A protein has these predicted regions:
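Acidic, low-complexity/disordered tracts enriched in E/D and polar residues
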Residues: 1-46, 50, 96
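Long, charge-rich, low-complexity alpha-helical segments
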Residues: 37-100
């Protein structure tokens, strides 16, 4: 399967926060933020996170990255797929197909 055709949704047990000029993801466990697993996002990570909505395919987000950050499509794809792999590994996102 073409990885760029996948769609993801955010795990409801992860909170996104902007603090000053920094963006973070905090997993919630037992109704408490698990501060040992805070994930800091750079500008590209924040941009991607804000566009994960359960509807957009990764190819759509890749195109947005190319437009927003003036990078070439292969570089945008590489960065996007690496970030998505990191988020999946930490269970911060779920493939939409996995919900069905």
């Amino acid at each position: 399967m073409d990885h760029l055709k996948k769609s993801y949704r955010k795990n409801e047990d992860v909170v996104f926060r902007r603090i000053s000029d920094e963006s973070i993801l905090v997993p919630i466990r037992d109704n408490v933020g698990d501060l040992a697993f805070i994930y800091n996002l750079n500008d590209v990570g924040t941009f991607i996170w804000e566009r994960i909505d359960g509807k957009r395919q990764l190819v759509d987000i890749q195109e947005m990255l190319v437009d927003e950050f003036d990078v070439n499509p292969p570089e945008a794809e590489r960065d996007l797929l690496q970030f998505i792999a990191d988020l999946e590994k930490m269970s911060f996102i779920v493939t939409v197909d996995d919900d069905r």
